[in-house]
């Protein structure tokens, strides 16, 4: 099972990134577990300098912007 981590404090951009990621996973039919990481120490430990962020299986893929559903689908496939 793929693990997708959404880094953010719950802001509108963070929520949009999560929505796009969930839609991408659904459209691709991927079995994935989502984890929201809101604690600033964990966000900094992951190496993020801007929010929101998205990691796949612990590897940071997106930082500081809201990726489109199509971009996320490319990352996941």
From Swiss-Prot:
Catalytic residues (positions): 11, 14
Superkingdom of this protein's organism: Archaea
Molecular function per GO: protein-disulfide reductase activity
Pfam families reported for this sequence: Thioredoxin_3
Signal peptide bounds: none
Main function: Does not function as a glutathione-disulfide oxidoreductase in the presence of glutathione and glutathione reductase. Has low thioredoxin activity in vitro.
Family: Belongs to the glutaredoxin family.
Official protein name in the record: Thioredoxin
